[in-house]
Amino acid sequence: MAFNNKKKNANYISAKESRAIARENRKITQEIEKKRNRKHIPEEEYVTKMKNPENCVEFDNVQTYFFTDIGTVKSVDGVSFDVPQGKTVGIVGESGCGKSVTSLSLMQLVQRPSGQTVGGEIRFNTGDHVYNVVNTPTSVMQKLRGNYMSMIFQEPM
């Protein structure tokens, strides 16, 4: 029986390729985490203005990716929509299309360090301030969660 080494499965990556991808993705996530976990971040970096003051939340070209050992999964890639004050908005779509990741991005609860919101803006209006959640430090988000925003996830228990 002859074994042909020249045929390569399109869905297969070598251990060497996997290590290179993992190394690059670790570098990317470490850089993002380093920026996020800085001390004394000036408010100018995360306090912003709403495009429409009638909204309580604005998703603008949001990109949330998962950096794995075998590549990058673009779970949410370019999502934009508004949530007007006093209104209920439903997000509907097929399983795996990014509904939960979108809501986790708003709460800054995406599983880090592999999951990161890498682009766009999520503007959240507390009434006193407008925060770009993508750039808001973890310490500030912890104060916002529960006091100004909360979420009931599809599987609470």
Residue ranges of predicted features:
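ABC transporter nucleotide-binding domains
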Residues: 1-157
